[in-house]
Amino acid sequence: LYNVLKITSLEELREAAETGRLREIPRMGEKAERNILDGIAKSLARRGIPIVRAMALTESLAGQLGRQNGVRRALMAGDCRRYREMCDGISVVLVSDKPARALAQAASSFSNADVLEASDSLLRVRSEFGEISVWAEEPGHAGSALARATGSARHTAALERIAREKKLSFVETRLLDESGAPVAAPDEQSFYGLLGLPYIAPEIREGQGEIEAALAGRLPELITIEDIAGDLHMHTVASDGVGTAA
């Protein structure tokens, strides 16, 4: 690409594919152009932090914050816990008897970051790695906090709706009863149970029908590493191959 067309950027590659200039290169035809344009479109649509990088950053941050005085546990949450291929940011939940103090200590770790939001239960900053959310709650509400920090916006909105149907409120990191008193949910199993739901695995908390499936007793069984017997890789006419799978 560089030797023939002097292409040095993604934008130049897209322009060459759109104008037909790629065909100046041997064995580059219409099919190759289409595949390149499709690949560029997918790449641009998946901006964010790759899951491998996000996982490493989250584990490092959780390890650092988990060593703070008064922090019992530091748990992975957000896109990373849902194993999104590309993560919008990283999230950690701190379990502490004094959550506000835990967040104040965490804030000192981000002295060079822009603070986007700060409350007694959430610290959200923009750093060189992207957006970072640090939640904090008491042990008795760790389950509701982790559920809040893990699910997608659509999933948590559905949980809020179901809570209202149960005469409860799901506000920030806690469940509240009709009087406004907090309802304990020390783990996610108890949190979902209070809403009349079975435990929903983080990987499917996307607001794409998992709530309805849970209510109907039709949650899918997730594939685990023990289920994988091998890896099959092939190129067919569906991509850049010349034969079919048959």
Q: What residues fall within each predicted segment?
A:
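Accessory alpha-helical DNA-binding modules that contact the DNA backbone or grooves
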Residues: L1-I90, L94-L123, S127-G130, G143-S144, ...
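Residue-level marker of alpha-helix boundaries and capping positions
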Residues: V52, T150, S239-V242
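Conserved active-site and cofactor/substrate-binding residues in soluble primary-metabolism enzymes
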Residues: A56, R154, G243
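A short acidic-to-branched-hydrophobic micro-motif
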Residues: E131-E138
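Short, solvent-exposed helix-loop connector elements
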Residues: S144-T150
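Histidine-rich, glycine-flanked metal-binding segment
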Residues: P186-P220
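An N-terminally biased module of ancient metal coordination in phosphate/nucleic-acid-related enzymes
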Residues: A213-A246
